């Protein structure tokens, strides 16, 4: 695990423990989604939080100004703690790790699917249903289009990649021809 992920996971685990004790797991995730959305929309905020040149107390004040009254007291306190420990730049990783912990708790897995062409809603639902049957878990699908696949798709579930793309098939054919395995 990358050191950034280790820091993010450590803080996410601590917050999850508090959230479970106080029965606010869902509220914390809702607050994190608001924070995530705000940071996507407010580039200056994101840059300030990530900047090593801005002092920790200024980051704490900035987070309090932006999110005070908009998030639960527990999340506001957590943001202050993160900033005061000079760890505010890890906030995106903390959110990502918290979401992963929540998904794990709820039996949900994230699946990244790349296709050569856009899938319609019916195709996406069929694929999601098949993946849920295959994994015996609820699936959160993240779709992306990659024209370089030529055709077919790739599916990533955790560290496992299922590659059914034409690009992959052509690469395998090329390797087999080069190795003289084709008679």
Curated annotation (Swiss-Prot):
It comes from the Bacteria. Keywords: ATP synthesis, Cell inner membrane, Cell membrane, CF(1), Hydrogen ion transport, Ion transport, Membrane, Transport. GO terms for cellular component: plasma membrane; proton-transporting ATP synthase complex. The keyword Membrane applies. It is found in: Cell inner membrane. It is a peripheral membrane protein. It holds the Pfam family OSCP. PROSITE patterns: ATPASE_DELTA. GO terms for molecular function: proton-transporting ATP synthase activity, rotational mechanism. Signal peptide: none annotated. InterPro entries: ATP_synth_OSCP/delta_N_sf (IPR026015), ATPase_OSCP/d_CS (IPR020781), ATPase_OSCP/dsu (IPR000711). Belongs to the ATPase delta chain family. F(1)F(0) ATP synthase produces ATP from ADP in the presence of a proton or sodium gradient. F-type ATPases consist of two structural domains, F(1) containing the extramembraneous catalytic core and F(0) containing the membrane proton channel, linked together by a central stalk and a peripheral stalk. During catalysis, ATP synthesis in the catalytic domain of F(1) is coupled via a rotary mechanism of the central stalk subunits to proton translocation. HAMAP family: ATP_synth_delta_bact. F-type ATPases have 2 components, F(1) - the catalytic core - and F(0) - the membrane proton channel. F(1) has five subunits: alpha(3), beta(3), gamma(1), delta(1), epsilon(1). F(0) has three main subunits: a(1), b(2) and c(10-14). The alpha and beta chains form an alternating ring which encloses part of the gamma chain. F(1) is attached to F(0) by a central stalk formed by the gamma and epsilon chains, while a peripheral stalk is formed by the delta and b chains. This is ATP synthase subunit delta. It comes from Chloroherpeton thalassium (strain ATCC 35110 / GB-78).
């Amino acid at each position: 695990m990358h050191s950034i992920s280790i820091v993010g996971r450590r803080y996410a685990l601590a917050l999850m423990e508090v959230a479970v004790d106080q029965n606010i797991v869902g509220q914390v995730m809702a607050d994190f989604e608001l924070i995530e959305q705000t940071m996507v929309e407010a580039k200056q905020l994101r840059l300030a939080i990530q900047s090593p040149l801005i002092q920790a107390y200024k980051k704490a004040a900035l987070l309090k100004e932006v999110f005070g009254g908009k998030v639960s007291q527990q999340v506001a306190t957590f943001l202050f703690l993160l900033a005061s420990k000079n760890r505010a730049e890890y906030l995106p990783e903390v959110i990502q790790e918290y979401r992963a912990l929540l998904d794990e708790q709820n039996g949900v897995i994230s699946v990244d699917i790349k296709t050569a062409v856009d899938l319609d809603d019916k195709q996406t639902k069929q694929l999601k249903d098949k993946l849920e049957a295959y994994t015996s878990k609820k699936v959160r699908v993240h779709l992306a289009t990659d024209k370089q696949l030529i055709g077919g798709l790739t599916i990533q579930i955790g560290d496992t990649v299922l590659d059914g793309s034409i690009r992959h098939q052509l690469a395998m054919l090329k390797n087999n021809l080069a190795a003289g395995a084709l008679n």
